[in-house]
């Protein structure tokens, strides 16, 4: 029987493998493509195709990432896998590959290791909402008590970082057996099928950008004589309709106004939607009341803040970053959406300096408020040159 043609009408979900080096992330990624293609259709990818991850640039940072896709009975998955630990750190902090959920791969023979912990912590910091666990290499463990012990350790670790460890699904299996098409004791092919069915049920379908509350970062402001002030930008999420109220948030005190027109390519429209570049005409707003770096948003959905905890990756010298470390009291610019704001960096206790190539948790205080929420990405710049990337982990004030 011929495979059915690829249908775009299944819901699309982004996932990725995380976990310690050599615990089997890439083998599992290959097994997922094979088992899904055999079970539900689609094409398989070989281990070495995935392992030679192409280099890509996100915000000027070089990251090696492999992208594969596979189908379950009800969904289409886009899956990212990184060859090295540093690639994970960069990927998660820059949001180059946003994950709706992560598959934590942990070797049943070794149990949780330092990167297992670090990837769970990173997932918490960057806002990965769901984790499903695959206890791999179960074919190398004969002792059921040992498996139980490792499972308990993983659950404890998840609880430590505010994931629901006791309720997290844990699938026990062998990615290598699944890849070889074997299924002794149900730990090969059927374990991977069970993993995919668990992704289907445990990770909720993400809310599409268009269904979220309206937000547009302002890129430019014009005044059109006789008509008023127009702000332009790309709608990040939601829909704006003519005659709807909007708030202008960030940098100055929040103000309210009404959208009296939407235009795109010089044509008037009834609405602007997520992903579109539009001009929005604002009623009674003066040219000098609005500036680049503010956002237009559905009233009450986003607030301006100045102080937050964040997870930051500092570019290495090879990536065009700093050549020297920085110390507490470092004051670079933080580039949010469309503008730079100066901020002061407070390092964690016991950390004296931060080297290029490090990732670090720190608290930043900006000199002007920016419309922000947890999970917002930013760049760190010095005089227009990017020296780091970060993500808001927790707003403080």
Curated annotation (Swiss-Prot):
InterPro entries, per database record: EF-Tu_GTP-bd (IPR041709), EF-Tu_GTPase (IPR050055), EFTu-like_2 (IPR004161), EFTU_2 (IPR033720), G_TR_CS (IPR031157), P-loop_NTPase (IPR027417), Small_GTP-bd (IPR005225), T_Tr_GTP-bd_dom (IPR000795)
Q: Which residues bind Mg(2+)?
A: 26
The residues that cross the membrane are none
Q: Which residues does the annotated region (G4) include?
A: 136-139
Per UniProt, GTP binds at: 19-26, 81-85, 136-139
This enzyme's EC code(s): 3.6.5.3
Give a Pfam family name: GTP_EFTU_D3
Question: What's its catalytic activity?
Answer: GTP + H2O = GDP + phosphate + H(+)
Segments for region (G5) = 174-176
Task: Give residue ranges for domain tr-type G.
Answer: 10-207
Q: Does the keyword Metal-binding apply?
A: yes
Name the Gene Ontology molecular function terms of this record. GTP binding; GTPase activity; guanosine tetraphosphate binding; translation elongation factor activity
What keywords is this UniProt entry annotated with?
Cytoplasm, Elongation factor, GTP-binding, Hydrolase, Magnesium, Metal-binding, Nucleotide-binding, Phosphoprotein, Protein biosynthesis
> Quick one: a GO cellular component term?
cytosol
User: Its quaternary structure?
Assistant: Monomer.
What exactly does this protein do?
GTP hydrolase that promotes the GTP-dependent binding of aminoacyl-tRNA to the A-site of ribosomes during protein biosynthesis.
Instruction: Tell me what this protein is called.
Output: Elongation factor Tu
User: What is the gene name?
Assistant: tuf1
């Amino acid at each position: 029987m011929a495979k059915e043609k690829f249908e775009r009408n299944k819901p699309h979900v982004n996932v990725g493998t995380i976990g310690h080096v050599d615990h089997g992330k890439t083998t599992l990624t290959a097994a997922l493509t094979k088992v899904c293609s055999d079970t539900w259709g689609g094409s398989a990818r070989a281990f070495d195709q995935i392992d030679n991850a192409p280099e890509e640039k996100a915000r000027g940072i070089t990251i090696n990432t492999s992208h594969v896709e596979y189908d379950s009975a009800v969904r289409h998955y886009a899956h990212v896998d990184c060859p090295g630990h540093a690639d994970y750190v960069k990927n998660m902090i820059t949001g180059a590959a946003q994950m709706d959920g992560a598959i934590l791969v942990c070797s049943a023979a070794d149990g949780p290791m330092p990167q297992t912990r670090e990837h769970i912590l990173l997932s918490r910091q960057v806002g990965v909402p769901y984790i499903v666990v695959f206890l791999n290499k179960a074919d190398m463990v004969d002792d059921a008590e040992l498996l139980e012990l490792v499972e308990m350790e993983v659950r404890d670790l998840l609880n430590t970082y505010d994931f629901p460890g006791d309720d997290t699904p844990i699938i026990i299996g062998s990615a290598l057996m699944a890849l070889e098409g074997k299924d002794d004791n149900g730990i090969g092919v059927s374990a991977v099928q069970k993993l995919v069915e668990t992704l289907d049920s445990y990770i909720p379908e993400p809310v599409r950008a268009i269904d979220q509350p309206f937000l547009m970062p302002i890129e430019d402001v014009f005044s059109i004589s006789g008509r008023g002030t127009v702000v332009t930008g790309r709608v990040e999420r939601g829909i704006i309709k003519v005659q709807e109220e909007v708030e202008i948030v960030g940098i100055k005190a929040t103000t309210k106004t009404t959208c009296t027109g939407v235009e795109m390519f010089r044509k008037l429209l009834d609405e602007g939607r997520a992903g579109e570049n539009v001009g929005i005409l604002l009623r009674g707003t003066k040219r000098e009341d609005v500036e680049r770096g503010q956002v237009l948003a559905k009233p009450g959905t986003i607030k301006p803040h100045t102080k937050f905890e964040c997870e930051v990756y500092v570019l290495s010298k090879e990536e065009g970053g700093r050549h020297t470390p920085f110390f507490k009291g470092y004051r670079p610019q933080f580039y949010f959406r469309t503008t730079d704001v100066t901020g002061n960096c407070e390092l964690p206790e016991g950390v004296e300096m931060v080297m290029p190539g490090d990732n670090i948790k720190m608290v930043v205080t900006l000199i002007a408020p920016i419309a922000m929420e947890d999970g917002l990405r930013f760049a760190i710049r010095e005089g227009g040159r990017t020296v780091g990337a970060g993500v808001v982990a927790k707003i403080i004030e």
